[in-house]
C-alpha cells in the first residue's frame, strides 16, 4: 500500500525530544562497561554553524552511536572555545560587550547543533569563558608555576602601534598590521611562558607510539619539534675588528662537514654583537631597525628578499687560521633559533647561495655527487644539498659527508680556543617555549599580582577566580584591563602593600589544551577528578581539521604532561586516535571584474545545465553571473550554504547522509544541490520500502533464512552488516554508505513482495530480520529515520538504545571461489566453482572454458596444475 512521504520536520524534533526526555545520551561515570571517549574539536562561537561543522560533528556522532550500540559506555560531550579576538572586534564594531556577543552566539549555535540530532551529553556543556572553567584554568596555572613550568622573560613581539596589541607573526603582512595597516614595531615586552621545551625529547619520542594518528600529522609535529644533532662552534674574531668583549662568535651547525665552503658569518639583528655595533654605526642601526619591522616567522623569512650589511668584523676560519671571513647582519637569521648566528656555505644552501651572489662572496663547492667527475663539480645557480663526496676540503677530500662530519667534530672538539674546547657536540630543538601572554581583555586573566616589595606573587587558590570585570569599554584601542580604574589595583597577598594585577590574559590555545580533561567531570571543584580523568583518558577518537595538526595538538600533548607532573591526570597523551577530516567546498559565483567584483551567494542563484555546460543566473533579475573555482566555504567569497536552510528543506538526516557519503572522510567534499537531493531521495526510498511492508511485518519474529525464498535477502543483509561493521571500525563512512545503498537495492524487491501479502511466515521472518539489520546499520548516519522505521515495525524502545546486530557466519561465507585460469603462465579466463570442489572437478571445469578449448584445439594438455582455491595453470 502507498504511504505518506517521510516528513523530517515532524519526525526529527519528535525523536530529539524523546532522546532528551529519556536521557539516552547522558553518560554515567560509574557505568561498569568498557569506556569509549569520542570528541570532536569544539567550535568557536562565531555566530552560526557552517557545513564544515555539520561534517565534523556528523562523523563524531556516527562513531558515538556505533560504539554505544556495540556495548561501550560512550562519552560524547560538547562545549565552546569562547575566548578570543573576534569578540573584541565585534565589541568595537557593534558596540556590544564581548560576553553578550559570545553567549548570544552560543545560544544560536547550540540550537543548530541540537537540530542535527547529535548524541551529545549536554549536561557536561561548558564554555571556556565561563567563570567556572577559567577558575580551574587559573588553578592549573598556579600549580604549573609552583612546579617551575611557568616563567617570565623579556621577549620580542610584533607591536601594532594603532591597535595597541601584540600581533602573531602571521598577522604581520609586508611589515604592517593585518587590521590597522600600521607599520609594525618590534618591542621587548615581559611575557609569560610555559616550559614546553622541558618535554621536547619526550614529545618527539612518544610520536612513534601514536599509531592511530595520521602519519602526516606526526611528521608535521616531528618537524616542528625539530631535533637536530650538530656542533656548537666558536669562531675567533680578528683582533681590532670586533668591539671589546666579543673575542668569539658561537655558531650552531648541523653541517660541520661543509666548513671549507664557508664564505661568511651572519648574525641576527638582535644578536648582542649587532646591538653593540648599532650603538656606534648608524648604517647598521638602521638596517637592524628595518629587520625588526618585518614579521619574524620562518615563513616570512623564507619568502622575503635576503638582505645583509657587512659589519666590518672578521672571524678566523677554525680549520685554516690564514683564512678570514666577513661577519654580516642578515635579515634571515633569528635570535630565537640556535645561537642567533650561522656560517654561510653558499654551495650547500640555496639561501646562502642567493646571499653570496648578491654580495659578491666566494662560492666553493665542497660536496659533489659521487662519480669520476666529482673533483671538477661546480655550483652555479642551484646549491647542492644532498649527501655526496667531499671536494676542495683539505684533509676531508674523498670522504663521504657522514664520515667528514665525524672527522670535523673530532678535530674541533680536541682543538682549544682560550681555555675551552673550540667546539662540542650539541642536540638542538627548533621548538621554543610557549609564550602565552596576550594584551587583550577577552581571555583568561593570568592569576598573578605584582608587588614592589615581594615581586611576582601568584594569586592564592583561596582567592581564585580572578574574574574579568564587566564594566569595560572598547572606545579606544588597547587592553581595557590596563586602564580599568579599580580592577587592576589590589593588595599583595603576602605583605598587604598596594600592588597591581597582571593585565595580560592567556593565549586562547591554553583554553583548548585541557578542555577534554574537564569534560570527564566538569562539576568538580578541582580542575579534574584524577580517578575519573584517568578512567576516560586518553580520548579514544579525536576528530578535527588538519589545520590544528601542530599548535593545538602539540600544546594539548604538553598540557597532559604538565597536568601529570602536578597530579591532575595520570596519562601522557591526550588523544589515542586522531582523524583529520576534509573540508566542505563549494563553487564560487561572482559578477564584475577586478575591484568591482562582487561575490554572489548560491541561495540567490538559479543553475541551468545544458549539454554538460552549467550556467548561473540571478533569481532576482535573470542576469548571468560567472561560475568560479571550487573553494572552501567562506563568508568572504559568499559560497556558504546555511545548514539551517538544508535542514528546513530536507531534514538533518539528509544533510548528515550527504556529507558522510559523497567522498572519503579525509578528503574534501564538494557541496552540490544535486548531491543533497540524491541523499534525500535515498532517505525517502528507505522510508517507503520499509513503510509499505511494515503492516505485513508487525508481530513477526525476525529470523534469517537458511534456504529458500528468503535466503537472498538474509545473505545480503548479513554480508552488508559484516562489511559495514568493518568500515565503521575504520571510519570509512562513505564505503559503509555505499554498501547500504546496495543493500537497499537488494531488499527493495523482496520487501515489495512482502508488502503485496501472501508470503509465508518464514519469508516474512527473513524479511523482518533483514529490515531490522538495515535500520540498525543506518541508525548512526540517519538516526531520526531509523527511529521512525523502527517504530513503524511496531518495536518498542529506541534504536538508539538497541544493541548492534550480530551477523550469522554461515550467511556471510562465500560458497564459491573465483580462480584465475592460466595457459603457459598467461591468464586466459576465470573459473567460478564450489569452494569444496575436488581437483578433478576443478581440472574438468577449467578445460571446458571456451578460451582454453580454442587453444587446445581438440588436443590434450601436457599438464594441469591446480592450487586449491587459488589458481589453475595449464601447460600445453
Swiss-Prot record:
ATP binds at residue 635. Keywords: Aminoacyl-tRNA synthetase, ATP-binding, Cytoplasm, Ligase, Nucleotide-binding, Protein biosynthesis. GO terms for cellular component: cytosol. It holds the Pfam family Anticodon_1. InterPro entries: aa-tRNA-synth_I_CS (IPR001412), aa-tRNA-synth_Ia (IPR002300), Leu-tRNA-ligase (IPR002302), Leu_tRNA-synth_edit (IPR025709), M/V/L/I-tRNA-synth_anticd-bd (IPR013155), Methionyl/Leucyl_tRNA_Synth (IPR015413), Rossmann-like_a/b/a_fold (IPR014729), tRNAsynth_Ia_anticodon-bd (IPR009080). The keyword Cytoplasm applies. PANTHER family: LEUCINE--TRNA LIGASE, MITOCHONDRIAL (PTHR43740:SF2), LEUCYL-TRNA SYNTHETASE (PTHR43740). This is Leucine--tRNA ligase. It comes from Agrobacterium fabrum (strain C58 / ATCC 33970).
Amino acid at each position: 500500500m502507498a504511504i505518506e512521504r517521510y516528513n523530517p520536520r515532524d519526525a526529527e524534533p519528535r525523536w530529539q525530544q524523546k532522546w532528551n526526555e529519556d536521557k539516552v545520551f547522558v553518560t554515567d561515570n560509574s557505568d561498569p562497561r568498557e569506556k569509549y571517549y569520542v570528541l570532536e574539536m569544539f567550535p568557536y562561537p562565531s555566530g552560526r554553524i557552517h557545513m564544515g561543522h555539520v561534517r565534523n560533528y556528523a562523523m563524531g556522532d556516527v562513531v558515538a552511536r556505533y560504539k554505544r550500540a556495540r556495548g561501550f559506555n560512550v562519552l560524547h560531550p560538547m562545549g565552546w572555545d569562547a575566548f578570543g579576538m573576534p569578540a573584541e572586534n565585534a565589541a568595537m564594531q557593534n558596540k556590544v560587550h564581548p560576553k553578550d556577543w559570545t553567549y548570544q552566539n552560543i545560544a544560536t549555535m547550540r540550537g543548530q547543533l541540537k537540530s542535527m540530532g547529535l548524541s551529545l551529553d549536554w549536561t557536561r556543556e561548558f564554555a571556556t569563558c565561563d567563570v567556572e572553567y577559567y577558575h580551574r584554568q587559573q588553578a592549573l596555572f598556579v600549580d604549573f608555576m609552583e612546579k617551575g613550568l611557568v616563567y617570565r622573560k623579556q621577549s620580542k613581539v610584533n607591536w601594532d602601534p594603532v591597535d595597541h596589541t601584540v600581533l602573531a607573526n602571521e598577522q604581520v603582512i609586508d611589515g604592517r598590521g593585518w587590521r590597522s595597516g600600521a607599520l609594525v614595531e618590534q618591542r621587548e615586552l615581559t611575557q609569560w611562558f610555559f616550559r614546553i621545551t622541558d618535554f621536547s625529547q619526550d614529545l618527539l619520542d612518544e610520536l612513534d607510539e601514536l599509531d592511530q594518528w595520521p602519519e602526516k600529522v606526526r611528521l608535521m609535529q616531528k618537524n616542528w619539534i625539530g631535533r637536530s644533532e650538530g656542533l656548537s662552534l666558536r669562531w675567533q674574531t680578528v683582533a681590532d675588528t670586533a668591539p671589546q668583549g666579543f673575542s668569539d662568535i658561537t655558531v650552531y651547525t648541523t653541517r660541520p662537514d661543509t666548513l671549507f665552503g664557508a664564505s661568511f658569518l651572519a648574525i641576527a639583528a638582535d644578536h648582542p654583537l649587532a646591538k653593540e655595533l648599532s650603538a656606534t654605526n648608524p648604517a647598521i642601526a638602521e638596517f637592524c631597525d628595518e629587520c625588526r619591522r618585518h614579521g619574524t616567522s620562518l615563513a616570512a623569512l623564507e619568502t622575503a628578499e635576503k638582505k645583509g650589511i657587512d659589519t666590518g668584523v672578521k672571524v678566523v676560519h677554525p680549520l685554516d687560521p690564514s683564512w678570514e671571513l666577513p661577519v654580516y647582519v642578515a635579515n634571515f637569521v633569528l635570535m630565537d633559533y640556535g645561537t642567533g648566528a650561522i656560517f654561510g656555505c653558499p654551495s650547500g644552501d640555496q639561501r646562502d647561495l642567493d646571499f653570496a651572489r648578491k654580495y659578491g662572496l666566494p662560492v666553493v663547492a665542497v660536496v659533489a655527487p659521487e662519480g669520476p667527475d666529482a673533483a671538477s663539480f661546480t655550483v652555479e645557480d642551484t646549491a647542492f644539498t644532498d649527501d655526496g663526496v667531499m671536494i676542495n676540503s683539505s684533509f676531508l677530500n674523498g670522504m663521504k659527508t657522514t664520515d667528514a662530519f665525524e672527522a670535523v667534530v673530532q678535530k674541533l672538539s680536541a682543538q682549544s680556543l682560550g681555555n675551552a674546547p673550540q667546539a662540542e657536540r650539541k642536540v638542538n630543538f627548533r621548538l621554543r617555549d610557549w609564550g602565552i601572554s596576550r594584551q587583550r581583555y577577552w581571555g583568561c586573566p593570568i592569576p598573578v599580582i605584582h608587588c614592589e616589595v615581594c615581586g611576582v606573587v601568584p594569586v592564592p587558590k583561596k582567592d581564585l577566580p580572578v574574574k574579568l570585570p564587566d564594566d569595560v569599554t572598547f572606545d579606544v584601542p588597547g587592553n581595557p584591563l590596563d586602564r580599568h580604574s579599580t580592577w587592576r589595583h589590589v593588595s599583595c597577598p603576602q605583605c598587604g602593600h598596594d600592588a597591581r594585577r597582571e593585565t595580560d590574559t592567556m593565549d586562547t590555545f591554553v583554553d583548548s589544551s585541557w578542555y577534554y580533561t574537564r569534560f570527564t567531570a566538569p562539576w568538580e571543584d578541582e580542575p579534574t577528578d584524577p580517578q575519573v580523568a584517568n578512567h576516560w583518558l586518553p580520548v579514544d577518537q579525536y576528530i578535527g581539521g588538519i589545520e590544528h595538526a601542530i599548535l593545538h595538538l602539540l600544546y594539548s600533548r604538553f598540557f597532559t604532561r604538565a597536568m601529570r607532573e602536578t597530579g591532575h591526570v595520570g596519562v601522557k597523551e591526550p588523544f589515542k586516535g586522531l582523524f583529520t577530516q576534509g573540508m566542505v567546498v563549494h563553487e564560487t559565483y561572482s559578477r564584475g571584474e577586478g575591484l568591482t567584483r562582487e561575490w554572489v551567494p548560491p541561495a540567490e542563484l538559479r543553475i541551468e545545465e545544458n549539454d554538460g555546460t552549467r550556467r548561473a543566473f540571478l533569481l532576482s533579475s535573470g542576469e548571468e553571473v560567472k561560475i568560479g573555482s571550487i573553494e572552501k566555504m567562506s563568508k568572504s567569497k559568499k559560497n556558504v550554504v546555511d545548514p539551517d536552510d538544508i535542514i528546513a528543506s530536507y531534514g538533518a538526516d539528509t544533510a548528515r547522509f550527504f556529507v558522510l557519503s559523497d567522498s572519503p572522510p579525509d578528503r574534501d567534499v564538494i557541496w552540490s544541490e544535486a548531491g543533497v537531493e540524491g541523499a534525500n531521495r535515498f532517505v525517502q526510498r528507505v522510508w517507503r520500502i520499509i513503510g509499505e511492508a511494515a503492516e505485513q511485518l508487525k508481530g513477526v519474529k525476525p529470523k534469517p533464512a537458511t534456504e529458500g525464498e528468503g535466503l537472498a535477502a538474509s545473505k545480503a543483509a548479513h554480508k552488508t552488516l559484516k562489511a559495514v561493521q568493518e568500515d565503521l571500525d575504520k571510519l570509512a563512512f562513505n564505503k559503509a554508505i555505499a554498501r547500504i545503498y546496495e543493500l537497499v537495492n537488494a531488499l527493495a524487491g523482496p520487501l515489495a513482495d512482502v508488502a503485496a501479502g501472501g508470503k509465508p511466515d518464514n519469508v516474512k521472518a527473513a524479511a523482518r530480520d533483514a529490515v531490522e539489520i538495515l535500520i540498525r546499520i543506518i541508525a548512526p548516519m540517519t538516526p531520526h529515520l531509523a527511529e521512525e522505521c523502527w517504530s513503524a515495525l511496531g518495536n518498542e524502545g529506541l534504536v538508539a538504545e538497541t544493541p548492534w546486530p550480530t551477523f550469522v557466519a554461515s550467511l556471510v561465507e562465500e560458497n564459491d571461489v573465483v580462480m584465475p585460469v592460466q595457459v603457459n603462465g598467461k591468464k586466459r579466463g576465470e573459473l567460478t566453482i564450489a569452494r569444496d570442489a575436488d581437483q578433478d572437478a576443478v581440472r574438468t571445469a577449467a578445460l571446458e572454458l571456451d578460451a582454453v578449448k580454442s587453444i587446445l584445439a581438440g588436443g590434450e594438455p601436457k599438464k594441469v596444475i591446480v592450487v586449491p582455491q587459488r589458481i589453475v595453470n595449464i601447460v600445453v
